[in-house]
Regions:
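Conserved, well-structured interaction surfaces
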Residues: 9-10, 14-18, 22-28, 32, ...
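Flexible, polar/acidic helix-loop-strand segments at domain edges
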Residues: 62-64, 332-405, 605-613
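Long, intrinsically disordered, low-complexity segments
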Residues: 84-87, 161-163, 185-188, 268-302, ...
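An aromatic- and glycine-enriched ligand-binding surface/loop that stacks and positions planar moieties
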Residues: 1-61, 134, 138, 159, ...
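Extended amphipathic alpha-helical segments enriched in small hydrophobics
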Residues: 121, 201-203, 398-446
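Glycine-centered coil turns and helix-coil junctions that link the paired helices
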Residues: 97, 127, 134, 208-215, ...
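Alpha-helical scaffolds flanking conserved acidic
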Residues: 106-119, 190-198, 453-455
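Structural helix-adjacent loops and short alpha-helical linkers that scaffold large soluble proteins
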Residues: 102-113, 213, 238, 421-433, ...
Length: 613
């Protein structure tokens, strides 16, 4: 079928769009690599269970990657570099075809054209996030055959193009539930829309206006520095104002901030896709139970023998379900949560599902599922939970991968209003109060309003709001502080984990008093078939170091001592055990993935690695 036939038909053009989406759902793509902890870790907020290993998986999280990593690439091209480039090429063909043959006065064709610009921009932004400087190819290879060997390009060229393309995408695509959106895409969080395009523009702009690890010259294979992407402060101010404008357009159109912080994650886990019911602006869609292992990699760990016994007992856990417990939150983040912050107990859990036939840990009935308390190093990320699913997972869970939500728009607006940490303050022409946007997020978390905006406040709020959502690493990178913050997180962790008793330690210019003991009780949850859940946990907040007055071991309360580790020496935090990184000097040099060797070999000299790879 020729291009004229395809791109003069709205129905066939949508099939071409679906072909671009399909590339995001392949092995070693978002279903089990890019959405599953192989990127984005370790940070000051999240760390990986693989950090202790020496295999190729561990190098993806400890800043020690090599150019022949088999965990994320293989020589047959089945990897994220190939898939993202294919998304770009398919979108190039759609854009060229619709521009040449399509009727862009037709609402559906305008929408599909805008969605192609949006998907291409997303793929390019992901490539810049993962690899830094990559080839820029904005025309289909059929139009420009020589571009098959496109040369590595300065990322600023791509950023400049994304500014144009995402504004065009936002112009062409209506709001998600607008009548002009084709019915197959209308009100679907898994399809492009104006708000998602504007939010992605703001995200890309903040990266562009910020800092990055950059080679001294594009051709320099070894020398690099952390610096601004460009020196023109007038341009930086213009871009910050573009962020304000883009975010304001979304904020003024709709209030999508969920009342309950857990709601966006419950909805993702329960297959909600209605845009007007969700805080998320866009998520990569996967077929239910057919593709995707988001739950298996991102949920709290369940032991291999327990998960078999729990099948059919806990909602969401079916035969063959997996739970790797890949991501835990760091103590450095845990003790930054203010008293009463509702986000803490959604973001992490102090226990993991187990199945016990012997009635231990205060359980008076046998053959029940229960949450088993764990040590501090295993406080797992908990935004993705089997018990929130509406169907049972049998391995490929098919949970959609969320990309951006409304809270990010609010906090990006607040950040841009003060110029982030660039020293450049833009003119706010939107009539929106940036402090109010940040305080909307704090109020939802159950916290008092902040009195004034500052970069430190922005940095802390983004940590507590977005941990585990594959955002933090790139925040730290664009602020130019990843190395400093990861080293701080390790020093703090080392300072508490080598102890066995409660202590007072410095944290971000303040002192926190940390308990070595937690107290909790169990309650039965009828929604979980009577499973026992840890409840009323005390001892994780600053100053919670003495037994609560209401503690009564005769009334179901339990005391877990020394959450740091063994009774003798606390948690053995030797470099071979759970490091954040292998070598401190590599924290800048290995922020980006290398271009894999087989692509360089086949590039006719147009690809190479920087940063001393």
């Amino acid at each position: 079928m020729d291009s004229k036939t395809v791109f003069s038909s709205p129905e066939l053009t949508e099939q071409a769009i679906n072909g671009a989406y399909q590339e995001l759902a392949k092995d070693k793509g978002y279903i089990n690599r890019l959405g599953c902890g192989y990127i984005g870790l370790n940070t000051d907020c999240e760390w990986s269970a693989w950090s202790t290993g020496t295999d190729d998986r561990s190098t993806t999280v400890t800043y020690s990657l090599t150019t022949n990593n088999t965990a994320i690439s293989n020589k047959n091209g089945s990897d994220s570099w190939s898939y993202l480039n294919t998304v770009i090429e398919r979108c190039n063909a759609i854009i060229d075809g619709v521009r040449q043959y399509g009727d862009t006065t037709d609402a559906a064709m305008r929408y599909y054209l805008g969605e192609a610009y949006f998907l291409r921009s997303f793929a390019y932004l992901e490539m810049v996030k993962i690899w830094g400087d990559v080839p820029a190819r904005f025309e289909a290879i059929s139009t420009d055959p020589e571009s098959v060997y496109a040369k590595k390009t300065d990322r600023n060229v791509i950023y400049d193009h994304l500014r144009i393309d995402l504004q065009e995408a936002a112009r062409l695509m209506p709001w998600s539930n607008d009548a002009e959106v084709p019915v197959t895409a209308r009100n679907k969080v898994g399809r492009g829309n104006k708000a998602a395009a504007l939010a992605l523009l703001a995200r890309a702009d903040l990266m562009y206006a910020g800092k990055a690890v950059r080679p001294n010259t594009l051709e320099d294979r070894s020398e690099y520095s952390v610096r601004f992407n460009f020196e023109d402060n007038a341009l930086r101010k213009e871009i910050m104002e573009e962020v304000l404008s883009a975010c304001a357009a979304v904020i003024n159109h709709e209030d999508k901030l969920a009342e309950d912080y857990a709601q966006p994650f419950r909805q993702i886990c329960s297959d909600e896709t209605a845009y007007d019911q969700m805080e998320h602006l866009w998520a990569i869609p996967f077929a239910d139970g057919a593709r995707g292992q988001i739950m298996g990699f991102n949920s709290p760990k369940i032991g291999s023998s327990d998960i078999v016994k729990l099948s059919g007992k806990i909602p969401g856990i079916g035969d063959g379900a997996k739970s790797n417990g890949h991501i835990s939150i760091t103590p450095y983040l845990l003790y930054q949560f203010e008293k009463g912050d509702k986000r803490r107990d959604v973001t992490c859990v102090a226990g993991t599902w187990a199945y016990d036939d012997k009635s231990v840990n205060g359980i008076t009935e046998g053959t029940r599922a229960y949450q088993k308390s764990v040590n501090l190093k295993n406080y797992y990320l908990a935004k993705y939970r089997y018990e929130w699913m509406r169907r049972n997972s049998t391995g490929d869970d098919g949970i959609d991968f969320p990309v951006i939500r409304y809270a990010d728009v609010l906090l990006m607006f607040a950040e841009a209003a003060i110029g982030s940490n660039t020293g450049i303050t833009p003119d706010n022409k939107t009539n929106l109060n940036p402090l109010e946007q940040l305080n909307k997020v704090r109020r939802r978390a159950g916290l008092a309003d902040a009195d004034a905006l500052s970069f430190d406040l922005i940095m802390t709020e983004r940590a507590k709001e977005f941990t585990g959502e594959y955002i933090r690493k790139w925040d730290l990178m664009r602020w130019g502080i990843l190395k400093d913050e990861v080293e701080k997180a390790e020093r703090f962790t080392r300072s508490i984990m080598e102890n066995t008793e409660s202590m007072t330690v410095p944290l971000n210019g303040k002192e926190v008093t940390i308990s070595a003991t937690i107290w909790y009780k169990y309650r039965q949850d009828p929604a979980l078939n009577g499973a026992w859940v840890m409840d009323s946990i005390y001892g994780l907040g600053n100053g919670e170091i003495t037994k609560p007055a209401y503690f009564d071991k005769n009334n179901g309360w339990i005391e877990k001592t020394n959450i740091f580790g063994s009774e003798e020496k606390g948690w053995d935090f030797a470099k071979s055990s759970y490091p954040f990184y292998r070598e401190a000097e590599q924290l800048n040099a290995r922020q980006y993935w290398p271009v894999f060797t087989h692509y360089i070999t086949a590039s006719n000299g147009n690809l190479w690695n920087n940063y001393g790879y």
